[in-house]
Amino acid sequence: MTARRWTVGVDFGGTNVKAGLVSPAGRVVATRLLSSKAVSRPARFVEGLGRAVEDLARSVGSRPGELRGVCVGAPGSVDVERGVVHGLVNVPGWHRVPLRRLLERRLGCRCAVDNDANLFALGEFTFGAGRGAQCLVCLTLGTGLGGGLIVGGVLHRGVSGAAGEPGHMVIDPDGPRCGCGN
């Protein structure tokens, strides 16, 4: 099997960054785990993820430039067309970061960046419990809260890219602050 058919999927969470080497059949065959704190700044993230992707590619006798591509799911606002992360609620220092460009330069292969909950919804729709469904709502609950929405077999991002994202409100004005600042 040629390396150009393998991809790497990355889940950038508020606690951990998980990178998985994905076979052409959609199976995760190898993973690497990084602490989000260790790669909290964009330059550290690109370098740390670069090393993880190199290691994953080597595990199938390849190099990153020979992979089909790398896709990062980020827990925040993402301009999918330009590959720019506008902000991450639980990870400071991420404002208007051209992550796709930085990763493509580092890895030498095609890269994509999207909201993590949108990618979760697409994954379930394509390979998981949502396979065959025309409408699907996926909610992520971890360090943060997110949502992805598929209607009529199409991922919906909405005008501002936040379709499917659940809102939240202050319950106790004197309570602890949320990662969003409220």
For the regions a language model picked out, list residue spans one by one.
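Glycine/GP-enriched mid-protein hinge/lid loop-to-helix segment characteristic of carbohydrate kinases
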Residues: 2-6, 20-23, 30-33, 40-45, ...
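Conserved catalytic-loop position in the HRD/HxD motif
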Residues: 11
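A short alpha-helix-loop-beta-strand transition element characteristic
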Residues: 64-65, 158
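Glycine/Thr-rich phosphate-binding loops of Rossmann-like dinucleotide-binding domains
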Residues: 18, 80-82, 147
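Conserved Rossmann-like nucleotide-cofactor binding loop
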Residues: 15
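Assembly/interface hotspot detector across virion components, adhesins/toxins, and nucleic-acid enzymes
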Residues: 8, 76-78, 150
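Short coil turn/linker residues within repeat-based beta-strand modules
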Residues: 26-28, 82
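Glycine-rich phosphate-binding loop and adjoining helix at the ATP-binding site
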Residues: 36-38, 42-50, 54, 58, ...
